[in-house]
Amino acid sequence: MRLFRWVMLSVLLVSMALHAKAPAAPDQAEQALRAWINAFNDADREALMAFRARYKMRPDAQGDLEFRADTGGLQVLEIRESTPGRAQLLVQPRSNDRTMLVTTTLDPVGHAATFQFEGAEAPDRFKPKRMETTALLAEAKQRLDTLLASDAVAGTFLVAKAGEVQMAWHGGMADRESVVPVGVDTPFRLASLNKMFTAVAILQLQEKGKLSLDDPVAQHLPDYPAPQNLRGVTLRQLLTHTSGLGDIFGEKADANAGSLKTLQDYWAVFSDAAPVFPPGSKDQYSNYGFILLGTVIEAVSGQSYYDYVDAHIYRVAGMTATGSAPESSHVPGLAKAYTRVDHRWQRETRSLPWRGTSAGGGYSTVGDLLKFGEALRSGKLLSPSSLAAATSPQNHKAWYGYGFMVRGQGKERVYGHEGGALGANAVFYVLPEQAVVLVGLANVDPDAMGNVVNFVANRLPL
């Protein structure tokens, strides 16, 4: 499931053309970057449109304003680099702790630039102070209650230590039209959290000797319609978002939505796209890569993807309210999805897949995800060595393991996943050194729930 707007450790690219007649100033790239940040922080549509017109950018001031609403503006923490052709600033949104690097690059004559945002570890001097647990959880509840009072969130939130729940919160409406409130056991859509289940399944099959992470993907998919586009792509690269393969959203997906019912159905629509860079050479989030992993699981196990994860993950962990049933099925209590349109919540159905996939879109509860976290910690699902590899940095910029987002070192280690889409915000974290599991699920747009989960994760005592 695609990450909506900004989600931890995702990459947002915004390209523009700059036309500069004067010779490049020593800090020309930094000047351009700071000019955009100033206009962005002011949330002034006319100023943003004027800036975009001046620098020949595509006219998307509305996109700027939506990102501004998500972040509350950007605070510049430090300058990492400033040359005529490149500037890099460490910034932090005012609404959350998600430190980011924003990089601007210009060509030799200053005619083109790319603004790139990516997640970054904060230096110690910029990290929030740790809090005593009771005070921290009280603050988290207050934040959730405040968001609920302004109708900015609806969902469930859970903090557990060594399997014991320390805090549980739920609020808002699961179904606004029928006035059904959210309950502690309400299932919510998971967006990209399903990638963790897919990765666990692949690693289980590796432990059984049925595959190797360095296997060519094509070895397990002999019927793939465009094998030339899998040349050089390995299972490891799919797991780490380094394959160069692309997404499963956009016009092609919309035009074929009615035919995308099985994982192999996605082949017919997306197999014609070759990797956009040599496999293994870069990082780029790839939902299609996890679709392919799902079909590999089917080929190797002899089961459907859905039957495999149900038998070998959900049942083993005791997850009785987790699945990916088709949207036409009745899932008791499943929260409806709502997206913001003209400042009001509106039912979201257009972006939902026919059913959840190995890339995302299934559903679960905070209680089931706690069980998943405990099954990981206790070794029920993976051996200690497999779990350690899956939850350690495995890609170039060290933000992803095998199907798990990762950050921090030592006592500050965190692994899990975030997911966001229209009408869905899901976050699952394990802090292994503290034996803590954090879960937040919401049926409204990101990132209100995710921000609270990160607020707690970044302040728990070590």
Where do the protein language model's features map onto the residues?
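Positively charged n-region of N-terminal signal peptides that target proteins for export
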Residues: 1-5
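Catalytic loop of the DD-peptidase/beta-lactamase superfamily, centered on the K-T-G motif
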Residues: 21-26, 30-33, 92-169, 298-311, ...
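Active-site helix/loop module of the DD-peptidase/beta-lactamase fold
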Residues: 189-193, 205-246, 250, 272, ...
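Catalytic-site signature segments of enzymes, centered on catalytic residues
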Residues: 170, 185, 249-331, 356-370
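The feature captures the short pre-catalytic strand/loop hairpin that immediately precedes
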Residues: 137, 264-276, 340-354
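Bacterial N-terminal signal peptides
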Residues: 7-15
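Short active-site loop at a secondary-structure junction
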Residues: 148-156, 178-237, 277-288, 357-360, ...
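Short solvent-exposed beta->alpha transition segments
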Residues: 31, 35, 40-90
